[in-house]
């Protein structure tokens, strides 16, 4: 029986069996002052547990409905225990003065960054679920990162109240909608990465921006043919994320096996780390800033906030691109073909900083490609979304969905777009639910269509030295529609998909964009 879940955002609800810990905005743990703790002899009032919102009902609506239903009977909480739903903790008390305002701004910014960092847990849970249920082919690497997952199951909380480790064995089952979306995302990107590595005889290199707990490097190294074609693989992410990833790599024999004997951790040779100790060397933060968490012959793990590469960043926080990606931190070669991966990254970055990053990464390498997976708030039903498949140019592909043109033609087509399209109804629901998790989408708002996201690469990479720029973009719905009947049937039967209309709407709001640039 089909559920009435129209306009449901995948982040809003989950399966009943895992709704308490997966896909929900991380709950903040209340810290009670020591003088307010109860004495062991005092009577303690026990309140009934809060009901779990039912599937298909946005959490904000579920919470408001439940609160209205119980407010008449339940006693009002003590003033010191009040929290404002959906607002940072700093807004629940009145503050005054410049110092308090500055503190509030800093706290809010930190909460927003923590929320973005925490999205890696969603992606990892989704891949684990798709692997467990047979959507994706089995591989042993992804599960090695699972113990770094946050959980809402009562585990200790870390900075800003976000739960810390999720232990193997916890429920990781996602809804069929999410599992199919994860399959389409992972299988499409995996196929494009493999195609890139197999092109020609040259070795290739890959830069994954916002890599999180991704296991792609290890999957490449497990393939004899692909591993010999890979020159170097670089992963960049927040320091908190790379620290967690380092811990898992050092504790996992399977993951450590792909690091050669000359590898180093924060500059310390891997061979110097005791095989009987799982301790991670401390990064002392010397005067010369060091970004390489792990440095191996074919792999570099870098701890950096890519937003700080922008020249408008305060000098104390600014990161030099040459210092980050130069020979001191990585084994990248600017003359080799390079693929840059942005998996659900650009949506969270202010458009001016993201465009600067795209442009300067493109200028750094002679032959560069980009593969971006992101949110399309306007969906693929908007007229400009279709234009990406049929933009006219001198060398337009005959197949709708692949636009190939020179730099000049790419720029001329981009000027025909009058203004950003507004989010669809479903896109607005997505924004509301993500904002409840302290997630802002400045990049997705600035580029709401697939066409706009495709053209941002053409604009960023167009200069007098460019020989050719090719761009294309497709929604996950388009990829789903083009699957063979046998494969779609297999995926639908795995869990008995009965939410046809909902999955179509969901897949229309996620896209994969490709761009390629070569110099003469």
Swiss-Prot record:
Its EC number is 2.1.1.233. It is an enzyme of class 2 (transferase). Residues 79-89 have a biased composition (Low complexity). Residues 1-116, 142-174 are annotated as: Disordered. GO terms for molecular function: protein C-terminal leucine carboxyl O-methyltransferase activity. Pfam families: LCM (PF04072). InterPro entries: LCMT1, Ppm1/Ppm2/Tcmp, SAM-dependent_MTases_sf. The keyword Methyltransferase applies. One of its GO terms (biological process) is methylation. The keyword Phosphoprotein does not apply. It catalyses: [phosphatase 2A protein]-C-terminal L-leucine + S-adenosyl-L-methionine = [phosphatase 2A protein]-C-terminal L-leucine methyl ester + S-adenosyl-L-homocysteine. Keywords: Methyltransferase, S-adenosyl-L-methionine, Transferase. Belongs to the methyltransferase superfamily. LCMT family. This is Leucine carboxyl methyltransferase 1.
């Amino acid at each position: 029986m089909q559920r009435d879940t129209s306009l449901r955002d995948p982040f809003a609800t989950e399966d009943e069996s895992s709704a308490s810990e997966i896909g929900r905005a991380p709950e903040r743990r209340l810290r009670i002052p020591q003088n307010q703790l109860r004495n062991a002899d005092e009577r303690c009032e026990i309140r009934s547990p809060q009901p779990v919102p039912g599937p298909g009902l946005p959490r904000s609506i579920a919470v408001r409905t439940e609160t209205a239903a119980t407010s008449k009977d339940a006693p009002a909480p003590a003033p010191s225990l009040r929290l404002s739903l959906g607002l940072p903790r700093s807004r629940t008390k009145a503050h005054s003065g410049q110092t308090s305002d500055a503190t509030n701004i800093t706290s809010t910014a930190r909460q927003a960054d923590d929320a973005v960092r925490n999205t890696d847990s969603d992606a990892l849970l989704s891949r684990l679920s798709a692997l467990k249920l047979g959507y994706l082919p089995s591989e042993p690497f992804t599960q090695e990162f699972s113990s770094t997952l946050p959980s809402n199951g009562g585990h200790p909380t870390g900075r800003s109240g976000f739960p810390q480790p999720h232990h193997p064995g916890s429920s990781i089952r996602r809804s069929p909608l999410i599992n199919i979306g994860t399959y389409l995302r992972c299988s499409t990107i995996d196929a494009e990465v493999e195609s890139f590595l197999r092109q020609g005889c040259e070795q290739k290199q890959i830069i994954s921006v916002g890599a999180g707990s991704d296991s792609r490097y290890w999957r490449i190294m497990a393939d004899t043919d692909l591993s010999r074609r890979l020159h170097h693989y670089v992963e960049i992410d927040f320091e908190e994320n790379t620290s967690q990833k380092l811990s898992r790599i050092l504790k996992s024999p399977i993951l450590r096996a792909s690091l050669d004997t000359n590898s180093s951790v924060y500059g310390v040779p891997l061979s110097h780390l005791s095989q009987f100790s799982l301790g991670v060397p401390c990064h002392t933060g010397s005067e010369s800033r060091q970004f390489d968490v792990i440095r191996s012959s074919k792999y570099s793990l870098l701890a950096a906030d890519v937003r700080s590469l922008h020249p408008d960043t305060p000098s104390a926080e600014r990161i030099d691109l040459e210092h980050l990606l130069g020979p001191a931190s990585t084994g990248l070669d600017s003359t080799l073909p390079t693929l840059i991966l942005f998996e659900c990254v650009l949506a969270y970055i202010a458009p001016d900083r993201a465009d600067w990053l795209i442009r300067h990464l493109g200028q750094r390498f002679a032959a560069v490609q980009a593969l971006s997976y992101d949110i399309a708030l306007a969906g693929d039903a908007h007229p400009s979304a279709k234009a990406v498949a049929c933009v006219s140019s001198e060398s337009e592909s005959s197949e709708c969905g692949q636009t190939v043109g020179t730099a000049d033609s790419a720029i001329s087509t981009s000027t025909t777009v009058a203004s950003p399209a507004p989010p669809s109804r479903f896109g607005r629901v997505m924004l509301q639910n993500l904002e409840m998790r302290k997630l802002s989408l400045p990049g997705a708002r600035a580029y709401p269509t697939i066409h706009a996201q495709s053209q941002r690469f053409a604009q960023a990479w167009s200069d007098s030295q460019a020989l050719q720029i090719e761009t294309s973009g497709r929604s996950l719905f388009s990829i789903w529609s083009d699957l063979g009947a046998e494969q779609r049937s297999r995926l639908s039967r795995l869990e008995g998909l009965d939410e046809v209309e909902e999955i179509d709407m969901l897949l229309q709001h996620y896209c994969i964009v490709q761009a390629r640039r070569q110099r003469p």
